[in-house]
């Protein structure tokens, strides 16, 4: 039986002054699936890069899910009973290597978001839902003679990484750029040091990593048919990409047969992150995956205002509350500003149903169904 076997192909080409790619012909490396091994030859294609500040190398990934799940190794990564924590600390970080930097968003997206693959050679294992700390090069201007502070990033891959060999980790990073409110001009002195370092990095660059850290967003897998409701904004989708790859892409001992429901909030279509990957899961696993997008600059809510994730939550509130009553886990990840609106919506829905949101939230936390990681 034939399967769509393409999992990931990367091609690195220098950026021209007009920020466009050369015509490239490439061939995939061998990818091993749980039932066979395949080679795929790709015809010549044109890849047009959106204008990017990265003037070094961008590695574009052709990445799709496949119903023939990908074999992963080493399976010994499944053996640990507890998640790895703080293997490397700020005073003695691990020096990893940048593998690739890929611009994820289109030209109409406000801002730039990059997918960054880091090679740790298997020395910095992690679980889905954990974070790495990154220490950018240079001196901390507030503490002369000291390195920059650690910046935490939730990992956007499974423990096996995008190469499925347990040697890489992926980060989803939005470049932080500061614009003067009076002049409207960029002030580079106030730009985010770490995000710009990562988005400007090129293959072969070294990066200091700490961690892994975090237990709040770990994916509970004791019940294979559990329901997981994921609500993310922007780069907050990172841990959910890891969850979904583990559920639907990788051949792992934990055979997921429940429901995963992703709500993703971004500005517009060009801002969607990993959308092709999620759409493929939707097509391949319609009984196990639901995917709802809230595009604030393109969609309207039922009151005629901008569409945010809390509006989607309210739209499906009866289903969501029923699933929570049945034991579903619910996860929130993104900017801190997302939570007040979401909490207000959940409280309003609960009151409409004749319930106390405070009591319900307390019970969800007690049952370890409530997971929040905001920054």
UniProtKB/Swiss-Prot annotation:
Pathway stated in the Swiss-Prot or TrEMBL entry: Energy metabolism; photosynthesis
EC category name: oxidoreductase
Location of the protein in the cell: Plastid, Chloroplast
Pfam families membership: NAD_binding_1
SUPFAM superfamilies named in the record: Ferredoxin reductase-like, C-terminal NADP-linked domain, Riboflavin synthase domain-like
Coiled-coil blocks: none
A biological process term (GO) from this entry: photosynthesis
Catalytic activity: 2 reduced [2Fe-2S]-[ferredoxin] + NADP(+) + H(+) = 2 oxidized [2Fe-2S]-[ferredoxin] + NADPH
CDD domains: CYPOR_like_FNR (cd06208)
Cofactor(s) needed: FAD
Gene Ontology molecular-function annotations: ferredoxin-NADP+ reductase activity
Location of the FAD-binding FR-type domain: 91-219
Main localization category: plastid
E.C. numbers: 1.18.1.2
Record carries keyword Flavoprotein: yes
Role according to the record: May play a key role in regulating the relative amounts of cyclic and non-cyclic electron flow to meet the demands of the plant for ATP and reducing power. Is involved in nitrate assimilation.
Family: Belongs to the ferredoxin--NADP reductase type 1 family.
Name recorded for this polypeptide: Ferredoxin--NADP reductase, root-type isozyme, chloroplastic
Provenance organism: Nicotiana tabacum (Common tobacco)
